[in-house]
């Protein structure tokens, strides 16, 4: 059972359908006990960083998510959910994140002859050949975002180019993030969710 964090930000219906296709049962919940009992925690999200963090705080989930991740619970952040895993964001001011990954979230540059937000398909380049997410290499996934993670190279699994090098998958042991929407990325997106499923089943996050 995977628990999808319910904090009123993000389209969870398509994400649930993707896991259904992979024969992974899910529950949409903000109950700390259900999150703790799950095999993995999925943190979705669309919208603004500060509002999302406020929603997590309102539900008293910040400390819960931090404790679960630090106990070894697999955590997957998707789109804004990935950004929340980092230490801070400069979106509409300076805001603290969950601090589960090193780095901060910054605005995509608007002066590099690319459209902001990045909205559409982009081609991934694998940065960690031994990763379970190796099928992402040269494949296209679907993005919708105006901010991106600036983080250590040791956390980066894959990137795309959008004026700057944008981390598309990050991982630090059991904490993983995907900047793209796997549930909107067709077969390739399902492959990445399947890879995460296998990592959870094997309890093997040793690639980082």
From Swiss-Prot:
Describe its partners and assembly state: Heterodimer of HisH and HisF.
Q: What is its EC number?
A: 4.3.2.10, 3.5.1.2
> Which reaction is the catalytic activity of this chain?
5-[(5-phospho-1-deoxy-D-ribulos-1-ylimino)methylamino]-1-(5-phospho-beta-D-ribosyl)imidazole-4-carboxamide + L-glutamine = D-erythro-1-(imidazol-4-yl)glycerol 3-phosphate + 5-amino-1-(5-phospho-beta-D-ribosyl)imidazole-4-carboxamide + L-glutamate + H(+); L-glutamine + H2O = L-glutamate + NH4(+)
Q: Where in the cell is it found?
A: Cytoplasm
Enzyme active site = 79, 181, 183
Q: Which organism is it from?
A: Lactiplantibacillus plantarum (strain ATCC BAA-793 / NCIMB 8826 / WCFS1) (Lactobacillus plantarum)
Q: Which residues form the Glutamine amidotransferase type-1 domain?
A: 1-206
Q: Which domain of life is it from?
A: Bacteria
What processes does the entry annotate via GO biological process terms? L-histidine biosynthetic process
Note the InterPro entries from the entry: Class_I_gatase-like (IPR029062), GATASE (IPR017926), Imidazole-glycPsynth_HisH (IPR010139)
Role summary:
IGPS catalyzes the conversion of PRFAR and glutamine to IGP, AICAR and glutamate. The HisH subunit catalyzes the hydrolysis of glutamine to glutamate and ammonia as part of the synthesis of IGP and AICAR. The resulting ammonia molecule is channeled to the active site of HisF.
> What are the protein's UniProt keywords?
Amino-acid biosynthesis, Cytoplasm, Glutamine amidotransferase, Histidine biosynthesis, Hydrolase, Lyase
Q: Name one GO molecular function term.
A: lyase activity
Q: What is this protein called?
A: Imidazole glycerol phosphate synthase subunit HisH
User: Which pathway?
Assistant: Amino-acid biosynthesis; L-histidine biosynthesis; L-histidine from 5-phospho-alpha-D-ribose 1-diphosphate: step 5/9
One GO cellular component, as annotated: cytoplasm
Q: Which HAMAP family match?
A: HisH
**Lyase as UniProt keyword:** yes
Q: Which cysteines are joined by disulfide bonds?
A: none
